[in-house]
Each structure stands twice: as structure tokens, then as C-alpha cells.
Amino acid sequence: MLKLIRPAIVMIVVTTAVTGLAYPLAMTGIAQALFPHQANGSLVEKDGKVIGSSLIGQSFTADRYFHGRPSATTGADPNDATKTVAAPYNASNSMGSNLGPTSSSLMTRIKGDVATLQAQNPNAPVPIDLVTTSGSGLDPHISPEDAYFQIPRVAKARGLDEAKLRTIVDAAVEPRELGVFGEPVVNVLALNQALDASMTQ
């Protein structure tokens, strides 16, 4: 009986040691040696303090900043732990809204967002990305069109010339990966950092 069980036990121990200990430690070591910034979360610092990550979006709401896409993430209700409340860009609870195209709640929210955005820039069509959530609710990027659409609002709030602001957005556009994969994007946190930096020059 023991002869039959022993190979199975040895296999379990070896497999656990290799896949549960050796492999993770090896990958962690390689990542820390070759890509320490990425391995530690691609954190963004300002004046020695972490202000975010280039991989996770955050909620910018002030008119003087560019805004990201809507986020459907939720968090615990501080008044009732058994319930949840809206908590945009909650990195501990990545999720979409799960609302389908026939959802009245989704349509009401989108119509409200469209009306708000049209009031800010009545001379341009509202980009669809600015009224739709990403699958994770944590998308750190917007399309260049999303950023250009927001220029009038940000320029007015900061008292900046729109042409100067467009130059800042142009510089923040990240091209396709290897010139082929994906679409050009703008990292919202990086753009807002560049915007703040331009005000001190």
C-alpha cells in the first residue's frame, strides 16, 4: 500500500515546491532585477510621495484637470457594511457595471453624462469613451479625442490659451505599441502632471 501512495506523495511535494515556491521566487527575482519599477506597480511619485500608478486610473473631478472614463467600481457603504456604494476607481474592487444595453439605469446615467459634457463643450460631439466604462473600471487611459474634447473646460478653469493646452495634450499622446498594436492613448495622471508642471514654468 505504501509503495502505491509514496509516488503520489512525492509528486505532490515536488510539484508544490516547484510551482508554489521555486517558480514564484525565481520570477519575482528576475522581475526585480530587470524591471523593478514595473514589478513594484509602476508607482508615480511627486515630491517623494506616491500619488498613484500609471497602470491604475484615479478619479479626477475638478474642472482644472482632465478626467478619465466613468468607473463603475463600488466600495463598502460606511453606514452599512452589508451594502455597497459607488466608489469610482476603487482598485480593490475592479469591476464593470454589468448593465446591458437595455438597462434604463445605464441609459439614464449616460444621458446625464452626455448633457453635462455637451454643456462644457457644445461645439464638438461627445466621444463615446467619456460616457462608457471600461471592463475593469480602472482604465488609466483615455483616447486623444477624449483629451482634446476636454480642452475648453480645462483652459477656462486654468485661464490658459487653448492652443497651449493642445500642445501639452499632443505631447502626452502615447503611440501604438510597436507602431501596430492597440490605439494611441493618453495617460490621464501623466497628462495632469504635465499640466501642473507647465503652470510652474
Curated annotation (Swiss-Prot):
Subcellular location as annotated: Cell inner membrane
Membrane topology: Single-pass membrane protein
Highest taxon listed in the record's lineage: Bacteria
Entry's Gene Ontology cellular component terms: plasma membrane
Primary location: membrane
TM stretches of this protein: 9-31
GO molecular function annotations of the record: ATP binding; P-type potassium transmembrane transporter activity
Disulfides per UniProt: none
Alphabetic keyword roster: ATP-binding, Cell inner membrane, Cell membrane, Ion transport, Membrane, Nucleotide-binding, Potassium, Potassium transport, Transmembrane, Transmembrane helix, Transport
Pfam families: KdpC
Self-association and partners: The system is composed of three essential subunits: KdpA, KdpB and KdpC.
HAMAP family the UniProt entry points to: KdpC
Function: Part of the high-affinity ATP-driven potassium transport (or Kdp) system, which catalyzes the hydrolysis of ATP coupled with the electrogenic transport of potassium into the cytoplasm. This subunit acts as a catalytic chaperone that increases the ATP-binding affinity of the ATP-hydrolyzing subunit KdpB by the formation of a transient KdpB/KdpC/ATP ternary complex.
Family: Belongs to the KdpC family.
Protein name in UniProt: Potassium-transporting ATPase KdpC subunit
Origin species: Rhizobium rhizogenes (strain K84 / ATCC BAA-868) (Agrobacterium radiobacter)
Species lineage: Bacteria, Pseudomonadati, Pseudomonadota, Alphaproteobacteria, Hyphomicrobiales
